[in-house]
Amino acid sequence: MDAVTTYEVFSAAQWAGLRAATPLPLTEGDLMVLRGLNERLSLDEVATIYLPLSRLLNLHVGAAQQLRRVKDTFLGRPVGRRPFVIGIAGSVAVGKSTTARVLQALLARWPDHPRVDLVTTDGFLYPNAVLASRAGLHRKGFPESYDLRRLVQFLADLEAGVEAIDVPVYSHATYDVVAGKAQTVRQPDIVILEGLNVLQGPERAAAIAVSDFFDLGIYVHADEADLERWYIERFLTLRATAFRDPSSYFHRYAAMGDDEARAFALQIWRTINGPNLTENILPTRARADVVLEKGPDHAVRAVHLRRL
């Protein structure tokens, strides 16, 4: 990753020193649940990278809560209940979902904010039938494939302190939004919103962007050559596992041989995921407050922290 003057850069070893004796609340059993497909996340990496990050986020949450109390007191109104919102962005196959799950687990262990909800933007994709009638399913994951109005309304409701908000649910097995199913968000202390394009700016002047609602943005970065390799490895693993389920949208790929599956996954990367990364996702990295830079082994090797 190129050096960016607006960030302070810490090696993994330097960042680990910022843990400040924070105890590690997770076990290897917890990691088995949190770890993503083909990822080698270890307790050591959680302790050296994610635990210090959770400490930083905890300090940010406390400061934001105090600032809101001061503002509400100044305005002479009751102290409102609004969650601290964290956005996590990054490419397909980079491990942002695992990052989100680990941070959710760690942040929920801090006593001041035990209720941490994780919401993915997959649920805000237009249903397949709508996408097929518009740009086509090959554009799924590109900015135009999301119902941004609905996503912004969800975030506005969070901001307003709405007591219960229903969020659409996406199924990776059926490759579609699940009709009639919802995740209910009930005034949590923290909301983590994870998705490819969550750090994008507004499409036009004066428009509201999803990232306008974030208290802090995180971008998970890796070199494209590594991302391509990880994507192909993940596809091959899914072909031998989840794709074998007859109800899976991708069941037809389960019978592919190794060479055919590799070629197919590479084609998907080169024609869909790669261009989306280059055109839409990577340009949003500069909007992040924290960049987690991964090496070829999927481990975070540096943390880029925006200067105040």
UniProtKB/Swiss-Prot annotation:
Superkingdom, taxonomy of origin: Bacteria
Organism from which the protein derives: Sorangium cellulosum (strain So ce56)
SUPFAM superfamilies linked: P-loop containing nucleoside triphosphate hydrolases
Gene Ontology, cellular component aspect: cytoplasm
Reaction it catalyzes: (R)-pantothenate + ATP = (R)-4'-phosphopantothenate + ADP + H(+)
Cysteine-cysteine disulfides: none
Keywords assigned by UniProt, alphabetized: ATP-binding, Coenzyme A biosynthesis, Cytoplasm, Kinase, Nucleotide-binding, Transferase
PANTHER family for the chain: URIDINE KINASE
Any GO BP: coenzyme A biosynthetic process
InterPro entries per the UniProt record, alphabetical: P-loop_NTPase, PanK, PRK/URK
EC number: 2.7.1.33
Subcellular location: Cytoplasm
UniProt xrefs under CDD domains: PanK
An annotated Gene Ontology molecular function: ATP binding
Family membership: Belongs to the prokaryotic pantothenate kinase family.
Keyword ATP-binding: yes
Binding positions (ATP): G90, S91, V92, A93, V94, G95, K96, S97
Protein name as catalogued: Pantothenate kinase
UniProt pathway annotation: Cofactor biosynthesis; coenzyme A biosynthesis; CoA from (R)-pantothenate: step 1/5
